[in-house]
């Protein structure tokens, strides 16, 4: 039984590292998406029929629609940083993985990181690698409100 537990633990660690590295790559391209080549590379991480649910922005039903919003509202305006210690990865048997955590958004012009939100992504494992099929971005709030809640 301990061999199985060790194998499962190793598989979980490999999955965590894989998805964490992919998340970092997705958002490295997102953070540089004012460059059209980086926006296209960012696009490659998402399924054509990706569904993106945003608590304040609504729903998009395709990669093209999502990218149009990214180009219009995000590229050159702000970047994303994952909040250390919040990232989690869970396997989805026979499909892929679910990742979740908290991220902050930083204004490009001022370098101020005043927005926080929670996220969940569904990753599908395919022969050619991994692709994101669903994104939930929710709980958008100001970073100062979040730190005030954490204070005694």
Label every PLM stretch briefly.
Residues 36-95, 113:
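A solvent-exposed, acidic/Ser-Thr-rich amphipathic alpha-helical stretch
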Residues 46, 51-55, 96-107, 120-122:
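Short, well-ordered beta-strand segments in beta-rich or mixed alpha/beta enzyme
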Residues 66, 70, 84-90, 102-105, ...:
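Hydrophobic/aromatic beta-strand elements that line small-molecule binding cavities or substrate pockets
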Residues 89-97, 111, 123-130:
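A short, structured loop/turn motif at beta-sheet edges
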Residues 1-48, 144-152:
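Short, low-complexity N-terminal intrinsically disordered segments enriched in polar/charged residues
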Residues 110-114, 142-148:
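A short acidic/glycine-rich loop-to-helix N-cap element
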Residues 1-3, 116-143:
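Short beta-strand edge/turn micro-motifs at domain boundaries
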Residues 57-59, 104-106, 138-142:
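Solvent-exposed loop/turn segments at secondary-structure junctions
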């Amino acid at each position: 039984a301990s061999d199985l537990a060790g194998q499962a633990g190793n598989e979980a660690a490999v999955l965590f590292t894989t998805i964490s590295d992919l998340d970092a790559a997705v958002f490295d391209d997102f953070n540089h998406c004012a460059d059209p080549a980086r926006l296209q590379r960012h696009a490659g991480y998402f399924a054509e029929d990706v569904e993106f649910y945003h608590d304040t922005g609504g729903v998009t039903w395709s990669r093209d629609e999502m990218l149009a919003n990214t180009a219009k509202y995000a590229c050159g305006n702000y970047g994303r940083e994952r909040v250390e210690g919040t990232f989690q990865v869970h396997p989805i048997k026979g499909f892929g993985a679910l990742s979740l955590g908290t991220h902050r958004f930083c204004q490009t012009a001022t370098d101020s990181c005043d927005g926080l939100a929670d996220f969940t992504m569904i990753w599908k494992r395919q022969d050619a690698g991994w692709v994101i099929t669903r994104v939930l971005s929710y709980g958008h709030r100001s970073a100062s409100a979040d730190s005030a809640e954490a204070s005694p």
